[in-house]
Amino acid sequence: MSEEKHEIGLEVLGTEECLQLLSGAVIGRVAFQADGVPHLLPVNYAADADGTVVFRTAEHTVLESVGGRPAVFEADGFDAVNHTGWSVCVRGTGRELTGHDTTARRLLELTVIPWAPGQRDRWFAITPDEVTGRRIPLVRAADFGWIPGVVS
């Protein structure tokens, strides 16, 4: 775990921790541009040990446009009671998985179960150029001399 901090108190996560967090979540968001319009869509996904993110979509959806384009995938988790959380971003290029190469066949073996109803037979991956993450750590108010909700 990285001990590096932003000046605003966020912990910068190392690659290994980012990959571990990605492997434990099942929903994330894919951001990309199609026809000059930015899109940000939620997906069920799986990630491999290298941070490649795999998701499924139906025929004739805007998600098909991610193939061959720059894309960003984001997954996160939070604890609303303790005001902590994390976010991991995978920046890379999207591609459709057709099973015609060894990597595609391996990625198609990952378990991705869409929550939304309907058939989703098109598989896509975002191959990472960069994996980054941040965490909002548990902070005790007393450490900073303030109490939430109290104005002095």
State what each model feature region is.
Residues 3-29:
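Short, basic/aromatic recognition patches
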Residues 54-56, 73, 133:
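Short hydrophobic/aromatic-rich beta-strand segments that constitute the beta-sheet cores
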Residues 51-52, 70, 93, 130:
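Structural motif
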Residues 67:
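Short active-site loop/helix that positions an aromatic residue
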